[in-house]
Amino acid sequence: MKTLRTLIVEPGMAPRVAEVEDTLEAKQKVVGGLIEPVFPPSHKDDVCLIVNEEGKLCGLPWNRAIRLEDGTAYDIIAGTFLILRAPEDSEDFDSLTDEQIGIYTQMYA
């Protein structure tokens, strides 16, 4: 089974690097429910956040703010999320690069 190198961001915790199986079920297990990809405007590359689609409705704990390009917060994520690449020329998710792990570990620290 193919695995993806990702960052998992849990409420109140520092982001951590993890290998996650490239299956819908594995991603749903990490976020605790149905997944939804989110593409924050502050991200200048092909990275997306995989969040729990119903996190706010289910009352999951607040996690991190999502920001506009100027740094202004415009939304907040509820519950654990993971960060993956979502290349425009593909329908599949991909592993983060070492550079992206550094950038997003710092961004969501």
Predicted regions and their residues:
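Domain-length accessory/inserted modules outside core catalytic folds
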Residues: 1-109
